[in-house]
Structures are given as structure tokens and as C-alpha cells.
Amino acid sequence: MLGAGGIMGQAMAANLARSGFDVRAWNRSRAKAEILALDGAFVAGTPAEAADGADVVLTMLADLEAVAAAMDGRHGAIAAMDPGSIWLQMSTIGEAGTGRCAELAAKHEVAFFDAPVLGTRLPAEQRKLVILASGPATSSLRDLVQPIFEALGRKILWLGPAGAGSRLKLVLNAWVLTVVEAGAEIIALAEALGLDSHLIFDALEGSNLDLPYLRLKGEAMTRRDFEPAFRLSLAAKDAALVDDSARRAGLDLPLLKTLSDRLAEGAKQHGDKDMSATYLTSAPKTP
């Protein structure tokens, strides 16, 4: 497991170890992965050490640069993997990034699965992620990764060849990030108009307009509680991937372009906070 010290990766590695898998965990900041030893995981010093002889190598890292460094950089995992083993790539790295990883896997005769997830810290801890799985249809390979997915998530969607998972993840991220930014702006507007922002949720309660996720993030904004479940810096990265895919598809989607710019602006000051901290970019300025 590469990326075992992040918010998502640590929870996922712990659940795999608790489910009886032999987990070798690596993280760039080793100290963040050390706690996994309490669940029986071996904490490796390099990606290559974690991957050596493994049937499956799972990557859950911040971005394509981190994935490339862990897999193909100094002491990278890919050179230590046996031909016929499996690379389970679960980071959100977009279409182009997924294509690059698939090419690297093919070069080393490693089976490649593209399986990003829908969910943040709490679903990861509770094994309630939605797995957007795509990759080889070979039953022997899928039989190896299916139990891993079942230890991590509540729902597994098989979507076709590698790349399909990342494409659906981009579409779903477009929805999630739009909801969060919309929540931030309507709360800021309510406050600027002298209203108690809780009235928004009181008015929506019980109607078809009452989105649970909007309520979850919106109430965090009203409490000014920005403990990270998913960092704003990563939300900005994902929004840029969405915008890039829209442009590659020849679409003019100004809302998503503006969303990407807005989240990038917020991440400059509040990148380590939860993505709901995008509210701080819009919040009325106090004298």
C-alpha cells in the first residue's frame, strides 16, 4: 500500500490489515504510517520494499506526480513488482494520468486496474467507499482484487476497461465540488444579508431540495469547522482535472472553469483545511 499515511490511505490500509490481508505500508512521511503497525502492517522504508514480491500494489496518493514518484522514481515500486502482479491505482489522477500509469504497467507486464473511490475520511474509516473499478475482465485477476474492494467499500461498480473509473470519478467530482462551492456562496450571501445561515437548512428540510451532502458541508461552514476530511488543495487539484477533461472533450463549461479557478484561489490560503473552507473565500469581510 503506497500512500498509507494520508487521510484516505491510512484508513484504507488499516481496514485491509484488520481484514486479514498481509499489508506492507509505505508513506513518504514514514511517521504518518507507523500507527499501522498496531494493526499488524509492516511499515516499509521505500516503495520498492513495500512492493517486492507483492501480488497486489495499491496506490492512494495525492496526485499524478506523487504516484509517478512512488512507482517509477528512485526506489520505485514498479521495478520490484513481478510480471503478472497487479497494480491497483485508486488515486484521483485524471484521464491523462491514468493513461500514463497504464502504459507504465504494460511496459513492466503488470496488470493495471483503475479504481478511484467516491468518499472522504469517514466513509474510508467505515468501509463505506464506493469503488469505481475498471480494468482487465480476466476473472482470475478480478477474483484477486474483489476481496480487497470488499474490505474497503460498500459498493463496487465494474465499469469496463481501465480509464472508465477515472472518467466517472471526474463527472462525480464535478457534482460534489459544485455542491460545496454553491453551499459556500449561498451561506456567504445569507450572512451578508443579515440572515442566520441555519435558516437555509430549516427552509429546505423535508423537501426535494434538501441535499444531505449540502447540509453536511454547509453546517460545517456555519460552525467554522474545517477539520480536513478532504483537503481544499486536493479539491482544487480535482477541479482542474475536471476542467481539463471538459476541454479535451471539446466542451465549453464555464461553470466548471470558474469552479476550478475559485477553488485554486481558496487553496492558496486554506489548502490544508477541509474543502468546505472554500467558504472563507466568499465570506463577508468583517471590519
Predicted segment positions?
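NAD(P)+-binding Rossmann beta1-loop-alpha1 motif at the extreme N-terminus of oxidoreductases
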Residues: 1-59, 85, 90, 121-124, ...
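Rossmann-like NAD(P)(H) cofactor-binding subdomain of soluble oxidoreductases
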Residues: 47-52, 56, 64-130
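Hydrophobic beta-strand scaffold residues
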Residues: 23, 43, 111-113, 156, ...
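Helical "substrate-binding/catalytic lid" subdomain
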Residues: 164-278, 282-285
